[in-house]
UniProtKB/Swiss-Prot annotation:
Organism: Pan paniscus
Start and end residues of each stretch annotated as Melanin-concentrating hormone-like: 60-62
UniProt family annotation: Belongs to the melanin-concentrating hormone family.
Top-rank taxon, per record: Eukaryota
GO MF term set: melanin-concentrating hormone activity; type 1 melanin-concentrating hormone receptor binding
Protein name: Pro-MCH variant
GO biological process: chemical synaptic transmission
Chain residue ranges for the region called NGE-like: 23-41
A Pfam family that the UniProt record links to this protein: Pro-MCH
């Protein structure tokens, strides 16, 4: 039992950070679509706010 518990904990420590980093990539259908729509709405309504939030992206388009 002790050996099994240690193995389970080590798996959780490896999997949880991976899911946290790859969450948007792992679930594009659920999170990606909503994030994209909300981002487009923000760009249409307030370019000034976006220039502060996404300076690198705006430089690429210049």
């Amino acid at each position: 039992k002790h050996n099994f518990l240690n193995h389970g904990l080590s798996l959780n420590l490896v999997i949880k950070p991976y899911l946290a980093l790859e969450g948007s990539v792992a679930f594009p259908a659920e999170n990606g679509v909503q994030d994209t729509e909300s981002t487009q709405e923000k760009r249409e309504t307030g370019d000034e706010e976006n220039s502060a939030k996404f300076p690198i992206g705006r430089r690429d388009f210049d």
